[in-house]
Swiss-Prot record:
Swiss-Prot/TrEMBL site (Transition state stabilizer) positions: 257, 264, 392
PTM annotation, UniProt: Phosphorylation by AMPK stimulates activity.
GO biological process, one term: fructose metabolic process
Modified residues (N-acetylserine): 2
Enzyme Commission designation: 2.7.1.105, 3.1.3.46
Chain residues that bind beta-D-fructose 6-phosphate: 79, 103, 131, 137, 173, 194, 198
Protein name: 6-phosphofructo-2-kinase/fructose-2,6-bisphosphatase 2
Gene Ontology cellular component terms for the protein in this record: cytosol
Record PTM Phosphoserine, positions in chain: 467, 484, 494
Subunit structure: Homodimer. Forms a heterodimer with PFKFB3.
Family: In the C-terminal section; belongs to the phosphoglycerate mutase family.
GO molecular function, one term: ATP binding
């Protein structure tokens, strides 16, 4: 039989592009995003200077780190785009009708962007960062969510401690775009008057009557007390758990790797080797550094591997061993050099270079698995004061990615050299990083991200050993949502029905029909070796 070479080539290219698009979709939707069976809108509530933006940014950073696509929509940004110059607190008076119209219009524009993010951009959670202090505004948001079948979870920040409020104004609001080139006294005076404007119409959530059926958490006086009401699902329970662990007290987190090991010298990954001579020198230098810093109540954590324990032993302090701080499990590639892996497992070597974050070693872990494993460490770090974590390269990359808000593309390639300390100091909306080298030579274990200079059509198609089940379709928007028991959508599946109608469907497909249709899709090729 004769065939058309051009047609065959075109089919191959189309096949590759289809698989490539699937991989892009897989990259956007990690295991954690499947914890949300419908998009969720987190709505902040509270007077100005109550830490709403702090909580919004911190919560968003955490959710993105665990793999749930999340984005903050700050209403102040929309307001500043609509009103180029801020003059005084008069803009926020409830009897300023013109300003009230502008503020409502800004809210509607922001909600339109929320809808686009959750329905068109593969977002799973949107954080609506605004005061939302009136029931009228909250009802507007609830109606918006009902129309789009979004779940809603309110986070109200309540604070009546004047010292905390004043500290927040001085730390954050003085540098706000609303106050260019103003002195502290004028800023404080204007902002306190702005708060009074909001107090006139402030209607806190009422768990006993008007708001008893809403899902929310009240955070009182920066975590002194909490009130939780009607949590709907797993992701909301994770949000509550996270918010109950964070604090704003000053502290410093120190991250470093163990001293250089014998396997580092040999270029081998994994294993449980001891320190080299230079590694022991680093341990002594680390002890001297900590003594000079005079850090109060410092806790030291290590993994359960020999090289971190030997590093901590030289410090002359008590330390805790965490098994979940052990290095990433390289499976069959443990105690091998990269050259040996490339020679013995060339396909695996290429697969890991293709997508390092998602790639899982045969019989081992991926970076995505490691992030899941390290979540309890992050929770405990958020609860603690001053801590030194002595860990490993992959582990340290995951921890750094959380504090520095780095995504899956950057995480596996963060530079974490041996004999270097990362000093992390939490600040208002992020983390200040200082890098301290202790002047003890060590081998370089970093591998740069490989560059692929081949045209897409010439790139070999490989099946990834993913850390999650690949999607059967790259179209994440039209994928039917299965709502959990006890938390039905406010308006069940209306967007899907509309889509089916547009395509000429007589009636909405049932779950069984959807499942049968999925089984008719071509199955992906089996992995190169079992996970």
């Amino acid at each position: 039989m004769s065939g058309n070479p051009a047609s065959s080539s075109e089919q191959n290219n189309n096949s590759y592009e289809t698989k490539a698009s699937l991989r892009i979709s897989e990259k956007k939707c990690s295991w954690a995003s499947y914890m949300t069976n419908s998009p969720t809108l987190i709505v902040m509530i509270g007077l100005p200077a109550r830490g709403k933006t702090y909580v919004s940014k911190k919560l968003t950073r955490y959710l993105n780190w665990i793999g749930v696509p999340t984005k903050v929509f700050n209403l102040g940004v929309y307001r500043r785009q609509a009103v180029k110059s801020y003059k005084s607190y008069d803009f926020f008076r409830h009897d300023n009708e013109e300003a009230m119209k502008i503020r409502k219009q800004c809210a509607l524009v922001a909600l339109k962007d929320v809808k686009a993010y959750l329905t068109e951009e593969s977002g799973q959670i949107a954080v609506f960062d605004a005061t939302n202090t009136t029931r009228e505004r909250r009802d507007l948001i609830l109606n918006f969510a009902e129309e789009n079948s979004f779940k809603v979870f309110f986070v109200e920040s309540v604070c009546d401690d004047p010292d905390v409020i004043a500290a927040n104004i001085l730390e954050v609001k003085v540098s706000s775009p609303d106050y260019p080139e103003r002195n502290r006294e004028n800023v404080m005076d204007d902002f306190l008057k702005r708060i009074e404007c909001y107090k006139v119409t402030y209607q806190p959530l009422d768990p006993d009557s008007h708001d008893k059926d809403l899902s929310f958490i009240k955070v009182i006086n920066v975590g002194q007390r909490f009130l939780v009401n009607k949590v709907q699902d797993y992701i909301q329970s994770k949000i509550v758990y996270y918010l109950m662990n964070i604090h704003v007290h000053p502290r410093t987190i120190y991250l470093c790797r163990h001293g250089e090991s014998e396997f580092n010298l040999l270029g081998k990954i994994g294993g449980d080797s001891g320190l080299s001579v230079r590694g022991k020198q680093f341990a002594q230098a680390l002890r001297k550094f900590l003594e000079e810093q005079e850090i109060a109540d410092l806790k030291v954590w290590t993994s359960q591997l020999k090289r971190t324990i030997q590093t901590a032993e030289s410090l002359g302090v008590t330390y805790e061993q965490w098994k979940i701080l052990n290095e990433i499990d390289a499976g069959v590639c443990e105690e091998m050099t990269y050259a040996e892996i490339q020679e013995q497992y060339p396909d695996e070597f290429a697969l890991r270079d293709e997508e390092k974050y998602l790639y899982r070693y045969p019989g081992g872990e991926s970076y995505q698995d490691l992030v899941q494993r390290l979540e309890p460490v992050i929770m405990e770090l958020e609860r603690q004061g001053n801590v030194l974590v002595i860990s490993h390269q992959a582990v340290m990359r995951c921890l750094l990615a959380y504090f520095l808000d780095k995504g899956a593309d950057e995480l596996p390639y963060l530079r974490c050299p041996l004999h270097t300390i990362f000093k992390l100091t939490p600040v208002a909306y992020g983390c200040k990083v200082e890098t301290i080298k202790l002047n003890v030579e060590a081998v370089n274990t970093h591998r740069d991200k490989p560059t692929n200079n081949f045209p897409k059509s010439q790139t070999p198609v490989r099946m990834r050993r993913n850390s999650f089940t690949p999607l059967s379709s790259s179209n994440t928007i039209r994928r039917p949502r299965n709502y959990s028991v006890g938390s039905r959508p406010l308006q069940p599946l209306s967007p899907l029905r509309a889509l089916d109608t547009q395509e000429g469907a007589d009636q909405p497909k049932t779950q069984a029909e959807t499942s049968r249709a999925a089984h008719r899709l071509p199955s992906p090729a089996p992995p190169t070796s079992p996970s």
